[in-house]
From Swiss-Prot:
Name by which UniProt lists this protein: 5-methyltetrahydropteroyltriglutamate--homocysteine methyltransferase
Ligand binding (L-homocysteine): 440-442, 493, 608
EC number(s) recorded for this UniProt protein: 2.1.1.14
Keyword Transmembrane helix: no
Keyword Protein transport attached: no
GO molecular function list: 5-methyltetrahydropteroyltriglutamate-homocysteine S-methyltransferase activity; zinc ion binding
Binding site for L-methionine: 440-442, 493, 608
Reaction(s) the record says it catalyses: 5-methyltetrahydropteroyltri-L-glutamate + L-homocysteine = tetrahydropteroyltri-L-glutamate + L-methionine
GO BP terms: methionine biosynthetic process; methylation
Signal peptide: none
Pfam family, one: Meth_synt_2
Domain of life: Bacteria
Length: 766
């Protein structure tokens, strides 16, 4: 039969045991021995559950105490000087967690900021960015991989250690200090891979998986050349080597990947099914091909019949050289569907989490040589029933939603008048001062707010009691904003647990799991909502809260919504329709809410698109199509209102240059952005492009409890006013204030309002 394997398994545990142990360790409630015991138990359980599901070659090295890239940094001795405890023989778990979370001033290292964290390709997982110096030296400094191989082999498992490849590891890092080419470090790094391979061979390992996902990116020629050189050098080292690619197609790197002097190649046929015939034609006859046929990034069951067509064809061409796997590591999938006890039977039958995906992989591998086996036939029959159910279910397919989608006209995604005409009407109606002050939406989520929400969900608070509790929080937020002298107020979002979940709970077509947790980073786990069907809004979602807030003040109250692209990017999407279609459905639902807010007397509506840039495809040639439908979805949700109603959007990331035209195409009247940490340098993109609409550059960093002085904010605003005309500038924090405490929030806003008033004085004096 074909060989069944996985590229990695979720490390958090069925009940998030790793998260609980990490946090107990950080609080001093669990010692290192206790933490390590939890790790051993989880690894043993995860290997066994994969083996029981039919996986023949088990991944080792996919477990990490915080993040797999960080584990590699410790393994290679890539530890910034600020985390090196002098006198210690080598790195410890305290070193690892210090690199991830920072070190307080009273520790042995005297205080050190954490390493930068960023998204792992186009997933919602985050990794710790390696920091390289020009004189970087590499040395094996962390024994975790070898210890875990011994653990797994002692339990009787056939193992396949997993390593991030040398080129991907260097690509993911950043040069610190003097500028230099990271490829200059390759010759220093490669000997460590040789050492690792030799040690693994000595432990009885036969195969090693080397992850090189950057092969699905647009690579400079120098990096392509480096692949050939690196793997030619590694060719002489022991072990059979499987190079794993995922998250996309190899495209122009296909020939390079196919001809690397290794023993096998894994390809993602979920994201890029079209690459299958070319790979088979280009691959040398001695190589194993691992086909990623089960989606490792989503929660839907595999269409086994469709996947089996590929397996049968591959079996004829490859014989014993065929392996079957998920498309990528199952790190991005929840752990076990069997934990779900609140889903109805039909919906649950459509889903598969990591454990179930292992079984699907095993069935496909077995079907290659035993197509008539009872287990295979039963699984195929069940899969056919699931696909038929999903194809015809009225829960999924809503004629009214589809008819509305089909009726969309180009004019529906355009405001009635150009910005210049709209802004004149808005300024006349809103009557705001120069440098108007506002916040991004949320105010501190106190323990009393969280307790009230939890008590209401558990039935301990009646609806009337819950509404009064939230009204009390809204009154408090409005009162403070009026006392501070803010110009445009918000209601504070006390009733919202999460900017996606709050809306998803109120839309038809979404479902929530109880245990569908996935790791975002470290101990942070998220439970994305699942889009299972056509999306619509049965009733207003925010209107009563905002209407109540507006009734408390004569000042302008801003409505707060999450945009369609962000809703989509932070959910598990459908696989049976495109992301574009799902974004349009979400846009129509949000459009209805915007129109209802306007009808309720709300004159400013903010539609947050925090994930707009995150949705960009990995390959540049796919950007134009994404940007076209993403900007259209925003305009569609924002264009149902009169010219007098002002539409804001908020984006929180640090790179605008390459998407500035698309941001302008969204045609929001005001965009608020995160700029304080870049000292307003981000505004250069808006200045050079001559961005036409109004801008609120964030004037202080909400991620820090530090209160900025009035003078600091004045300096930033003056810097901004040199790039953007003063009449188009707003004054606001970088982001929402949900995670801050009230004292620091009030202190910072006092200084922000004072700074805006000083700028108005400058303007008046000319």
């Amino acid at each position: 039969m074909a060989l069944a394997h996985t590229l990695g398994f979720p490390r958090i545990g069925r009940d998030r045991e790793l998260k609980k142990a990490q946090e107990a360790f950080w609080k001093g409630e669990l010692d290192e021995a206790g933490l390590r015991a939890v790790g051993r138990q989880l690894r043993a359980a995860h290997w066994q559950v994969q083996k029981d599901a039919g996986i023949q070659l088990l991944p080792v090295g996919d477990f990490a105490w915080y993040d797999q890239v960080l584990t590699h940094s410790l393994t290679f001795g890539v530890i910034p000087e600020r985390f090196r405890a002098h006198g210690e023989a080598g790195p410890t778990l305290h070193t690892l967690f210090g690199m991830a979370r920072g070190v307080s001033d009273d520790s042995c290292c005297g205080g050190a900021h954490a390493q930068e964290m960023t998204k792992w390709f186009d997933t919602n997982y985050h990794y710790l960015v390696p920091e390289f110096s020009a004189d970087q030296q590499f040395q094996l400094s962390w024994e975790q991989l070898f210890e875990e191989v011994d653990e797994a082999r002692a339990l009787g498992h056939q193992v396949k250690p997993v390593l991030i490849g040398p080129l991907t590891y260097l690509w993911l890092g950043k040069a610190k200090g003097a500028e230099f080419d990271r490829l200059d470090l390759l010759d220093r790094l490669l000997p460590l891979y040789g050492q690792i391979f030799r040690r693994l061979a000595g432990q009885g390992v036969e195969w090693v998986q080397i992850d090189e996902p950057i092969l699905v990116l647009d690579l400079p020629q120098a990096w392509k050349n480096a692949f050939e050189r690196a793997y030619n050098l590694l060719q002489s080292e022991p072990l059979k080597k499987l190079v794993a690619t995922y998250f996309g197609g190899l495209e122009d790197n296909l020939g390079l990947a196919a001809n690397l002097p290794v023993d096998g190649l894994h390809i993602d046929l979920v994201r890029a099914p079209e690459q299958y015939p070319s790979i088979l034609d280009r691959l040398p006859a001695y190589k194993v091909v691992s086909l990623g046929l089960v989606n490792g990034r989503n929660v839907w069951r595999c269409d086994l019949e469709k996947a089996l067509e590929v397996v049968r064809h591959a079996r004829e061409r490859l014989g014993e050289r065929l392996w079957v796997a998920p498309s990528c590591s199952l790190l991005h999938s929840p752990v076990d569907l069997e934990r779900e006890d609140g889903l109805d039977a039909e919906l649950k039958s459509w889903l598969a989490f990591a454990v179930q995906k292992c079984r699907e992989v095993a069935v496909l591998a077995r079907a290659a040589t035993e197509p008539e086996a009872a287990e295979v036939l039963a699984a195929l029959e069940e899969s056919r029933a699931v696909q038929a159910s999903r194809a015809s279910s009225p829960r999924i397919h809503k004629p009214a939603v589809q008819a509305r989608l089909a009726a969309i006209k180009a004019s529906d995604a355009q405001r009635r008048s150009p910005f210049a005409e709209r802004i004149a009407r808005q300024r006349a109606g809103l009557d705001l001062p120069a440098f108007p002050t506002t916040t991004i939406g949320s105010f501190p989520q106190t323990s009393s707010i969280r307790l009230a929400r939890q008590s209401f969900k558990q039935g301990k608070l009646s609806e009337a009691e819950y509404i009064e509790a939230m009204h009390s929080e809204i009154r408090h937020a409005v009162q403070i904003q009026e006392q501070l002298g803010l110009d445009v107020l918000v209601h504070g979002e006390a009733e919202r647990n999460d900017m996606v979940e709050y809306f998803a709970e109120q839309l038809d077509g979404y479902v929530f799991t109880r245990f569908g947790w996935v790791q975002s980073y470290g101990s942070r786990c998220v439970k994305p909502a699942v889009i299972y069907g056509d999306l619509s809004r049965p009733r207003a979602m925010t209107v009563e809260w905002i209407r109540y807030a507006q009734s408390l003040t004569d000042k302008v109250m801003k409505g707060m919504l999450t945009g369609p692209v962000t809703m989509l990017m932070w959910s598990f999407p459908r696989e049976d329709v495109s992301r574009e279609v799902q974004a349009r459905q979400l846009a129509l639902a949000i459009r209805d809410e915007v129109v209802d807010l306007e009808a309720a007397g709300i004159r400013i509506v903010q539609i947050d698109e925090a994930a707009f840039r995150e949705g960009l495809p990995l390959r540049r040639n796919a950007w134009p199509h994404y940007l076209e439908w993403a900007t259209e979805a925003f305009r569609l949700c924002a264009s149902g209102v009169r010219d007098e109603t002002q539409i804001h959007t908020h984006m929180c990331y640090s790179e605008f240059n390459d998407v500035i035209e698309s941001i302008a195409a969204m045609d929001a009247d005001v965009i608020t952005i995160e700029t304080s940490r870049s000292d307003m340098e981000l505004l250069e993109a808006f200045e050079q492009f001559d961005y036409p609409n109004e801008i609120g550059p964030g004037v202080y960093d909400i991620h820090s409890p530090r209160v900025p002085s009035r003078e600091e904010i004045v300096a930033l605003l003056r810097k901004a006013a040199r790039r953007i005309p003063a009449e188009r500038l707003w004054v606001n924090p970088d982001c929402g204030l949900k995670t801050r405490a009230w004292p620091e929030t009030e202190a910072a806003l006092v200084n922000m309002v004072a700074a805006a008033r000083e700028l108005r004085g400058d303007l008046a004096r000319g």
